[in-house]
């Protein structure tokens, strides 16, 4: 029963949210802008603490875990991810020792293997044009790199917040088709404004004004003719 308001305000962003994530389940969080999706994710990641209520992992209040121990269980790609002026492999390894096999596997899963082979120094190519010594990635390539970094970490819980926002429709479809493979054996939470992505998930949770409004599968929610069905059908008009 979690509620949250930002400091200095009495306006709840989330109100009386109760839900659980099953191991290995792929869940989509959807809703209109301002529904509370990203805030919920930040609570899960302990970037914020609930105003009331609590969150548990394996039945234990997450505040009882050390912050470092807890965050090792999560691989997260936020909307406002950052890449650094470092070689590509170091961006993906994110401060850990580079495992070449894991690196290549992560690149392959996000469809970057061919692009990396074209880089002047392969995975050792520095990102961003530092006096001509590096390369600038496109928005879509940067987003794929951020997803590769999350997969490289190999944490049991994967969270992707708008992971395909900078991709064109064809590239987006490729990522969706690989979604189950990319998160095989992991618990995954996926946020997207594009309802077409939700078909790839086991479960869809619809947030509306900070509360859970609907919870079910893609087909079930379409049949209910509620918020999800309205969002899905509204977007579908632009693709027909």
Language-model region placement:
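ABC-fold ATPase nucleotide-binding domain signature/coupling loops
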Residues: 12, 56, 113-145, 154-156, ...
């Amino acid at each position: 029963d979690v509620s949250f308001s930002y400091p200095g305000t009495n306006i709840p962003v989330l109100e009386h949210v109760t839900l659980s994530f099953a191991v290995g389940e792929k869940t989509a969080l959807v809703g209109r802008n301002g529904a509370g999706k990203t805030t919920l994710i930040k609570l899960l990641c302990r970037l914020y603490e609930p105003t009331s209520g609590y969150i548990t992992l394996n039945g234990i209040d997450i505040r009882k875990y050390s912050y470092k121990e807890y965050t090792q269980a999560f691989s997260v790609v936020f909307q406002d991810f950052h890449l650094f002026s470092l070689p590509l492999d170091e961006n993906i390894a994110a401060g850990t020792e580079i495992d070449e096999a894991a690196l290549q596997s992560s690149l392959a899963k996000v469809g970057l293997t061919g692009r990396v082979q074209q880089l002047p120094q392969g995975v050792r190519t520095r990102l961003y044009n530092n006096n001509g010594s590096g390369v600038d990635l496109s928005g879509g390539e940067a987003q794929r790199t951020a997803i590769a970094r999350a997969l490289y970490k190999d944490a049991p819980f994967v969270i992707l917040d708008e992971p395909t926002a900078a991709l064109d429709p064809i590239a987006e479809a490729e990522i969706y088709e690989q979604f189950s493979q990319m998160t095989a054996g992991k618990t995954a939470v996926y946020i997207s404004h594009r309802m077409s992505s939700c078909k790839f998930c086991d479960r869809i949770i619809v947030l509306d004004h900070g509360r859970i409004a609907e919870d079910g599968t893609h087909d079930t929610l379409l049949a209910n003719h509620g918020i999800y069905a309205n969002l899905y059908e509204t977007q579908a008009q632009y693709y027909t």
